[in-house]
């Protein structure tokens, strides 16, 4: 009987601890998901992990760990991918210069933008624009 009581108490304690962990994860998931949506809606903004982490009262390291565990990508990768998707849209729909487009998408350096764009798409911004203009 005593052993059964210990097992029951141990089980209840484990459930309490787990539910507390789950509540904490849900709280952070909601906050980090909102940040992720903000990044995707405004990729041109000057995002930096330290400021974002401070916004949710986490250390940058803990923030990055949680972000990766929730979304299976890093915050930095999300920022870059959002900027590249934004650039792709404007390359297809405007005749904005590459220099202006890079600044518009949040890059301080046009060369850095062109390198990242090629890394993620396999082509330069100019090649991407030409390819999509010829499709129309």
Q: What does each model-identified segment do?
A:
Residues 46-82, 102-127, 131:
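Basic/polar phosphate-binding segments, predominantly the helix-turn-helix DNA-binding elements
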Residues 38-42, 89-93, 104, 128:
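Short alpha-helical segment immediately N-terminal to, or the first helix within
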Residues 96-97, 112:
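Residue-level recognition of oxygen-bearing side chains
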Residues 2-56, 69-81:
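Short, Lys/Arg-enriched, Trp-marked, Pro/Gly-tolerant hinge/linker segments that flank
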Residues 135-136:
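Intrinsically disordered, low-complexity basic tails/linkers immediately adjacent to helix-turn-helix/homeobox/MYB/SANT
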